[in-house]
Amino acid sequence: MTTYFDNLTAEQKSNIKFIVQRMNEKGITNPITQSAILAVVSKESAFIPRSEASYRNTENSRIRKIFGSRVEHYNEDELTRLKSNDEAFFNAVYGLEKYGQTANEGYKYRGRGLNQITFKSAYKKAGDQIGIDLVKNPDRLNELPIATDCLINFFMNSFKSAPSDKLAAYNASDINSFKSTKDSVGAVYNANSGWGTPKSAIDSDPTGGKAKAESRVQGFMEMIENLA
């Protein structure tokens, strides 16, 4: 039976090796954490840094699951028309002023990189941390070395600032303290969604992304062991 791992390309495998190497160099050294990050990245970008894919061929019901209240005021015909225009769609779902951007900048700062960093404020923060102006040059987030360092910085900073009760809910005290992949996947998924997302919402997994990551994490553990 063919598995997800049987279908990984040479480029994907090379990128995984590079990401693991950089995690070790930058301080994420627990293979249980590393495998969870890889599992989440696998469903976000498949290890090829890229801009967020079009939703024009996505069922409206799934769009509603993903974007919730941001699209609830559109009826079916309106949502179908909206998703047919990528720029208009991303401006509608991401053009939120509270993230430091104007209503017509949602498309410009849509998801990019390995973990689909989104919103102008997140681009600025990620760029400032590595000394590159990602606000001016957002497509640079799709370059593997930049995407990898932004990915690692994102999770390291996220776990450093995580509320202690959030980490305790996943039986952890810091990013390298996980003892089970169930906890590490849950925490990494929660961090990627934002710690403001309740654990109950993470566990309910309306989009199926967490289940996908959980189904792959053990395979990534084995890959990491083989790289050692």
Walk through the language-model features, giving the residues of each.
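Active-site-adjacent structural elements in enzyme catalytic domains
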Residues: 31-46
